[in-house]
Amino acid sequence: MTLDSYNIFNDEYLFNMPLSPLPKVLGSFETVQSVLTLTTPTLTPTTTRNIEDTIGHLLSDTQPDRGAGCAGFAVPKVLPNAMGAIEALGMGIPSGVNSLPIQPAYDVNLAQGSDSEDSNASYNDTQMNEEQDTTDTSSAHTDSTSYQAGQIMAGSVNGGGVNNFTNVLAAVSSTRGAASVGSSNANTSNTPARRGGGRRPNRSTNMTPEEEQKRAVRRERNKQAAARCRKRRVDQTNELTEEVEQLEKRGDSMRKEIEALTMSKNQLEYCLAAHRPTCQKIRSDMLSVTTCNGLIAPAGLLSAGSSGSGASSHHNHNSNDSSNGTITGMDATLNSTGRSNSPLDLKPAANIDSLLLQHIKDEPLDGAIDSGSSLDQDGPPPSKRITLPPMSTMPHVHMSTLMTPTGASSGSLQTPITSTAPVGFGSAFPVTTNGSSINTINSISQNNMNSPTLNALNKVPKERPNTLAFQRPVGHMHLTLANNNKPGGPTQIQGVPIQTPSTGTFNFDSLMDGGTGLTPVSGPLVPNSSSANKHPLELPTPTAEPSKLVSL
């Protein structure tokens, strides 16, 4: 028997290699079997690939004429386990092979890596190039040990590409025709052991060519989809990067623009500050302009306007009486006074404020209530009363001519307060005719109708008095004036003696008609024939009579 009869030693593997005796090349089967293990958990796909690369370089150095890997697959390796299997089976080796040179034996660790490389076959398959992946059924997807058996492994029922000793023994025994050994090894190889997870096996024995073609198409479609996904991620990343760069450029431009505007603002402020002292067009006192009666006027002229308001309003009847400091008596170009340098045209007139003040009696004023807003008050507004001359020197004047005006523009809807005694009480006072007094009262009333200084004086705070106004009941109202000659007033009302110290202050009529009884009121009001026909606004009120001061 020669070596040519063994298919395992054909020139596919031992091409251009001198033959040598097998006992000198390989160790015993027991030694190799004791070292090799089927499971090598310490090997990783990276170390396995490094071992394969080292073996490939060694083979390429010894075979310079063959293009290693030119057919799309790595050069198969001759491992010691196949040689040991032949020796263990007792196959005779001719003596003519002893003169062959000996190749150095492989390291056991390398043999372990090659033997167990199928345990990581799923990882190695993913690392192959695209030509090998698209051709699933090519010989590039078969492992090294299966290819070492050559056509013998293809002749087995389901070799499955499992790299173990049972497949090698089954291949050798099937080649030699040993039926018993071949059948037992074939039974053990029917159930290939899957050592670890990963992808499905590259080649399935029960798969039809149509299914293999479908698998190839499906894998190609999956690869294209994965490539599209990667491209989409790359494009999205590039778009985001470009957007970030654009935003950064925009931010830089905005910062530069802000700096330029700030510099321009500083320059303008500097120029303005340098020009203001030398500017003759705008005066500093004309910058603050206030309004008066809807007209623009400088603030410095309000004092002059307030001093001459009485005289101006006396000559200009279209002025507003309810505002103090009214500037009137000007020309129609008052709106331009804030921009002109000419003084205002104020007409001098006699100041009649001193003449009016001597006829006006000061009364307390509630500062929380405006005297002009009489509609917001419940009671009569606090008005100014004119001190009349003695009643003995006053003529019999009608009530409507002696009403004290509260201002031309006050708009009060409340009952006017008369300044004289009611007509019903007229017989109690000796009245004489004096034309001079009538003229004096009428002139004072006319001046008060046009003068705005009454409201101006109402806003001036005054001292609060310590006495209350009390009016003693007088007149022919069925009062018994038996003790009229005695000081202190009447002591009887309709024959009933008054024994209380108040003397008519808290009587029934005053409690019912004059208020709560706690405020000073006048005597009981008894209507007569003359006052019954008067207008309700002209009826006498408890505060209508001339008041007297009574110490509490």
Swiss-Prot record:
Keywords: Activator, DNA-binding, Nucleus, Phosphoprotein, Transcription, Transcription regulation
Residue ranges with Low complexity bias: 135-145, 304-325
Disulfide bonds: none
One GO CC term, this protein: nucleus
Pfam families given in the database record: bZIP_1 (PF00170)
InterPro entries reported for this sequence: AP-1, bZIP, bZIP_sf
Phosphoserine modifications at: S342
Sequence ranges assigned to domain bZIP in this UniProt record: 212-275
Annotated spans, Leucine-zipper: 240-247
Sequence segments annotated as region (Disordered): 110-145, 177-234, 304-346, 365-390, 514-552
A GO BP entry: embryo development ending in birth or egg hatching
Single GO MF annotation: DNA binding
Subunit field text: Homodimer. Heterodimer with Jra. The kay-Jra heterodimer binds more stably to the AP-1 site than either of the two proteins alone.
Function description: Developmentally regulated transcription factor AP-1 binds and recognizes the enhancer DNA sequence: 5'-TGA[CG]TCA-3'. May play a role in the function or determination of a particular subset of cells in the developing embryo. It is able to carry out its function either independently of or in conjunction with Jra.
The name this protein goes by in its record: Transcription factor kayak
Source organism: Drosophila yakuba
